[in-house]
């Protein structure tokens, strides 16, 4: 069966499930590798080298003039993250973003945040996944080492 481009991301946006054995999942694997490479490049630069932002802009597909993210930073699906104006994410953030993450205006995040938007299917836990979006509301301040893990069906 042939699947349209972006099909796997539609499934993720709708909560899944997705199946890693299906051909459509290759697009997700490609995005994960793209994101890992861009994060690794950004994280390899010295903290006082402002050019690390170029990799993060490519990761998220937008200019980050109004957003500040400190490295080290890890995100597996840059195409599933949106950030409004004035967002600040301190170092050591890990975003497992396949289900989607939205940072509304003015969100401030302390070091060490962890956000998970994916879960394993309870019956086929090695091959199928379900998803749920996380939205951090306008002007929220998130403390150090906070974990967000969606409770998924």
Which residues make up each language-model segment?
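Alpha-helix N-cap and coil->helix boundary residues
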Residues: 47-51, 102, 153
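Generic structural signal for beta-strand residues in well-ordered domains
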Residues: 60-62, 108, 127
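Terminal amphipathic alpha-helical/low-complexity segments used for targeting or macromolecular assembly
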Residues: 1-66
